[in-house]
């Protein structure tokens, strides 16, 4: 497990600021900071149109504001999960459960999930999908010496954009959002 004592400073993502490296000094919870974050999220949500892209826009707003806030403020717990990651994974699980119950034409979610909780744990509500594009290294590194660095960057960028497009198309086809994207990088991804 994670037994480190490092903490991130509580701040919102800001490309103009330095990288928020973990520090050994414990971070004090600040009520004023939390109010500022809530106000920022509220202001950002006012500008988001409620349509099929809403969830992805909301996800971006939450990522910008909650990445460096711990999901637990209890002094008895290790605060090593960000509030953003907690919210994102919770939304991914909820969307899987909702899709499964809708496919089963289940109307009474409370009965299925709470009153018959033990049985619901046995249901196949989740699928972990892994994708890997083979041959990426060959594509990236099959380049001549002249302008090699520029060529490597261009090919790497091309693959990243292609992968993001494939992921977005796949998520759209199965009626999921980017909340269900657990990881993407190096020509691979994990989706729940």
Question: What feature does the model see in each segment?
Answer:
Residues 1-192:
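Regulatory and interdomain segments flanking nucleotide-handling catalytic cores
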